[in-house]
Swiss-Prot record:
Phosphothreonine modification, residue list: 125
Family (UniProt): Belongs to the FIP1 family.
Compositionally biased spans, kind Basic and acidic residues: 1-10, 436-462, 476-506, 549-562
Region (Disordered): 1-107, 300-328, 371-400, 418-570
Cell membrane is among the record's keywords: no
InterPro entries: Fip1_dom, Pre-mRNA_3'-end_processing_reg
Keyword terms of this UniProt record: mRNA processing, Nucleus, Phosphoprotein
GO biological process: mRNA processing
Name used for this protein in its record: Pre-mRNA 3'-end-processing factor FIP1
GO CC terms in record: mRNA cleavage and polyadenylation specificity factor complex
Cell location: Nucleus
């Protein structure tokens, strides 16, 4: 191999190695800049160590295996890997030994602690490189990582929040005008309610009082959502100890019957329905929710000195439940059998086969007798009294028995037996009788006006036009007879009115037919007149033509006769 070829190969190998180093480790200018930055960053850290490592100058390592090899310079780059720069005039042998030189450099990435073991490789001087990011800080040898304890109670300057006295603060920014309380107090607290809450928590921790709060000005309401009021709003945690809120069962179980309380069983004023409070001890009773979870709690806690129970008032309280029970309509009591010595009530219907048409008389309601008259002295007709079977119940129509009404046990009185109050005693209010005569009177006045408008000579033939005292009915038969007569008269009036309307319709039809006939006759007469005039003119025209034809025929005949005479003469 000639010297020129050796120089060419040496230059090509060196250039190839430089390209690889630049591709792997960057340019020399960049390495110098990063070297200066690393020197500034590690100056403070290396000052704490006993044997500081100077990184300002490049570290020189000697290869112990080959003393004739020229020294290589190792520099630290930005990525923490040592790069070697070969001395000028290096040949192929030194290029081949670059792999052995890498084994002498020990690169440590991370923290360098004081008294760390020094690694010696192949008898060379070890190199410790401390490479760290700019934002990190070095921890001490005995430093303990301190985090945020979420379970620990909050503190203000080392004093627990519940024990801190707000009066001792020099500045009270929440008192300034325009300050938002939510920036200083959570859960809707203000200064007064926070003091009351701290006092309550203090007493609860000391075990002096469970729910009694010393200050009477504090109003603590327990609600689920934020309502914007200044009262305290807290939520009861699900894992709260229920032993502190025990509600003794003997406080509420006042010997109530758990069955249904019917109105006849009430001996005095109705007692409150405390079924909401008869729960097992150790639970918090919430009206309107379930026993397993607290869905919504409204109201204020009562300052109860007798027991440690929680009384919560919600949508349905016991005072609101009772009026609902009292407002229920009384149950329907079916009437019992009537005694045979008392006339039936007026609204009892007669048998269908014998009942007259139900048309009420003038100014007389059909349901009840007049207010100033006693009931009829004589009994009603036998057909109006319902037959009683052996069981005491009224028999049914057409021989069919009536099923007995099943009275429920308790809460209903037995069927009425014995004497019954007389009917006039039940009908002392005359106001309810005034409505029906007034309505009938208005109807009759309207009918009278219609009759007078239709036919002036028609009058009302009803004998019941007088007041009530003009009708003296001695029995039900006379009443039914008057009903029948009134129905017959009403039917006659209806028939007369229908016949009158029919006559009016027929009269109007005849009038229309007469008018139409008059128009037809006038049209036919005008048509006949027109035809006669046309016929006359036509006849005159024909007469003129015939006269002309006759006149024309006469001279023609004369001429023909003259011609014949001339021919004969010839």
């Amino acid at each position: 191999m000639s010297a020129e070829e050796a120089d060419k190969t040496t230059t090509t190998d060196a250039s190839a190695g430089d390209e690889e180093e630049e591709w792997l480790y960057g340019d020399e200018g960049e390495s110098k800049e990063t070297e200066e930055e690393e020197a500034k960053l590690t100056a403070a850290i290396s000052a704490t160590s006993t044997t500081p490592v100077a990184e300002d100058a490049p570290t020189t390592t000697n290869n112990s295996s080959d003393s004739a090899t020229p020294p290589t310079t190792t520099t630290t780059t930005g990525n923490g890997v040592a790069s070697q720069e070969e001395a000028p005039g290096e040949d192929e042998d030194s290029e081949s030994d670059s792999d052995d030189d890498d084994d002498d450099v020990r690169v440590t990435i991370g923290d360098i602690k004081t008294g760390a073991p020094q690694y010696t490789g192949y008898g060379g001087t070890p190199v410790n490189l401390n490479i760290k990011s700019a934002g990190s800080r070095a921890y001490g040898a005995g430093a303990k990582v301190k985090g945020v304890d979420l379970e620990a109670p909050g503190s203000i300057n080392g004093v627990p929040v519940l024990e801190a006295d707000m009066e001792s603060f020099e500045e009270k920014p929440w008192r300034k005008p325009g300050a938002d309380l939510s920036d200083y107090f959570n859960y809707g607290f203000n200064e007064d309610t926070w003091k009351a809450y701290c006092e309550k928590q203090k007493r609860l921790r000391m075990g002096l009082d469970v729910l009694n709060i010393g200050s009477t000005t504090s109003k603590i309401s327990v609600q689920q959502g934020r309502t914007g009021n200044n009262e305290k709003e807290i939520t009861i945690p699900a894992h709260a100890s229920k032993a502190e809120f025990t509600s003794p069962s003997n406080l509420y179980k006042a010997g109530l019957n758990q069955g249904r309380i019917s109105p006849p069983h009430w001996a005095g004023p109705p007692s409150q329905d405390l079924s909401y409070y008869t729960k097992t001890p150790g639970t918090i009773d919430v009206i309107g929710g379930q026993t397993a979870t607290i869905s919504r709690v409204e109201g204020r806690r009562r300052h109860n000195l007798e027991g440690n129970n929680i009384q919560v008032i919600s949508e349905h309280s016991s005072s609101e439940v009772e009026p609902e029970v009292q407002k229920m309509p009384p149950p329907f009591f079916p009437p019992g059998p009537l005694p045979p010595n008392i006339p039936p009530p007026p609204f009892l219907p007669p048998p269908v086969s014998q009942a007259p048409p139900l048309i009420p008389p003038h100014r007389m309601p059909i349901t009840v007798p007049p207010p100033n008259f006693p009931p009829p002295t004589g009994g009603p007709p036998p057909s109006l009294i319902p037959t009683l079977d052996n069981s005491g119940h009224p028999g049914g129509y057409d021989g069919r028995p009536v099923a007995p009404y099943p009275f429920p046990t308790g809460g209903f009185p037995p069927p009425m037996q014995g004497a019954v109050n007389p009917w006039p005693g039940l009908m002392e209010n005359p106001k309810q009788w005034d409505y029906y005569p007034r309505r009938d009177k208005e109807r009759e006045k309207e009918r009278e006006r219609e009759r007078q408008r239709d036919r002036g000579h028609e009058r009302d033939h009803s004998p019941n036009a007088g007041p009530y005292n003009s009708m003296a009915m001695c029995s039900d038969e006379e009443r039914y007879r008057s009903y029948r007569d009134y129905g017959d008269r009403g039917y006659e009036r209806h028939r007369e009115r229908a016949s009158r309307e029919k006559e009016e319709r027929h009269g109007g039809r005849r009038h229309r037919e007469k008018e139409e006939g008059r128009h037809k006759s006038s049209r036919s007469s005008s048509r006949r007149r027109h035809e006669s005039e046309e016929g006359d003119s036509h006849r005159r025209h024909k007469h003129k033509k015939s006269k002309r034809s006759k006149e024309g025929k006469e001279p023609s005949e004369e001429r023909s006769a003259d011609q014949e005479n001339q021919e004969a003469m010839e």
